Amino acid sequence: MQPNRRETLSLLAGVAPAALGMLSAVATTNGSLAQETKPNILFMLADNVGYGVPSSYNGGILDTPTPRLDKFAAEGLRLTNFNVENQCTPSRAALMTGRLPIRSGIGKAIAAGAPGGLHPWEITVAEMLGDAGYRTAMFGKWHLGAGQGRLPTDQGFDEWFGFETTDIIYWAGKPGMPLRDVHYIREAKKGETPRNIRVYDEDTRRQVDRMLTDRAVDYISKSRSGDRPFFLYVPFAFSHHPALAHPDFKGKSPGGEFGDSLLEHDHNVGSILDALTAAGLSDNTMVIWASDNGPSPLPTVTPQWTIGDAGPWRGEIGTVLEGNIRTPCMIRWPGRIPGGRVSNHIVAILDFFPTLARIAGGKVPTDRPMDGVDQSAFFTGKQENSNRDHVLLFLGQKLMAVKWRNFKIHLDGLDRVDGVIEDWSFPRAFNLAADPKERWNIIWQNTWLGEEIGPFVAAYEASVKKYPNLAGGQPNGEPPRYGAENAAAETGVEAVPRKLESIRQH
């Protein structure tokens, strides 16, 4: 049934700042949630873990228990409508900057060895928190550029141990692959040239998450006597294909290689949480666990490439179907975030930048469009509703869909990451509450949906006219100047007005 128009207009007015892609120009967050002793922040990011993988989501479809993740979920807030971007690089760019990745020319994952990545001009969450007095460390997968000036220690992290991307493990040791294409686990501190630690091959892939966990545990232990709060970012290799478990977990689950890897991941998360407890830091540490994308099911390759499950949703990585863009996310902060809470309100990975700024007393940039919204009051239970009711979903440089409340309006179609985008002349709409597989088009009975999403698209387009999206792969050097000379060729929404008009005509 069509919602009350007064209610709709009121709600639209309330989200206007988010729709415009701009946060209020509040330079600091004094009087915020930041305590006299600022909280530590620990962010653990899993790779391609679908909605149906943790037992606390959908009952654990894979029959592999995740007791530590389940306990963690029960101790805080479990989000069931957490939204990410279409692939690894865009999701990580959104997390780091609080901006739609298309604004920086990032539309898809960066291929191993390819140029580009997050421009040094971007302000990352690590830089923002560092300026707010935090020590910053990252142990894990970056996937936001491997060139000079684009590694984690160039983008706000005091130290980094990890790897640029995961696909590169297939190259090492293979016949015909030149030595220059061998990649390594690397390590650096700010201002240093990264050092090669170990060849990143399939054997190392089995070991790497244990290595990251050990680094995180050691960092937390040493932080017991620290005089400054820390921001620790741990983006695991799990569960990016191929699923390769540590030898200690080989054959320990009923779920094959992937199940073994899942058991290991649950154990690693538990080890890091136990380190917080042992150091006496649990009560003053905000901990976030999330996944950057949905599953990557490729059973035609090898069993090790068949990873994860999207639960009740349809879709896989590289699409904007719910199975990819709706992933598990859990947040714990004892005494500040009520335990045992579950919410189906829309939250986006974009929202962590302004939310953490509010919590830590950091500054949000005011010289560029910001798309994330502050969710601190929602997370801490001071308000029931999220400050977001919609997300714009891009693929490459193209707006593919708009999700608003329980409705999803697809402007074009793509069912598989290796498929071809279908250019639809008429949008399709789905009621996610009744149709989680996004199969039953309801646009003919609900043409009014075009009027609802129109303002969101128009607001984004207006912001792009003022601050043109940057072309991808921009070189290092001077900060980009907003203007035609640096603008991307397309905004990603050129065809949308025509498609929305086709709805109005019916």
Stretches with model-predicted labels:
Residues 2-423, 427, 432, 436-506:
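Formylglycine-dependent sulfatase
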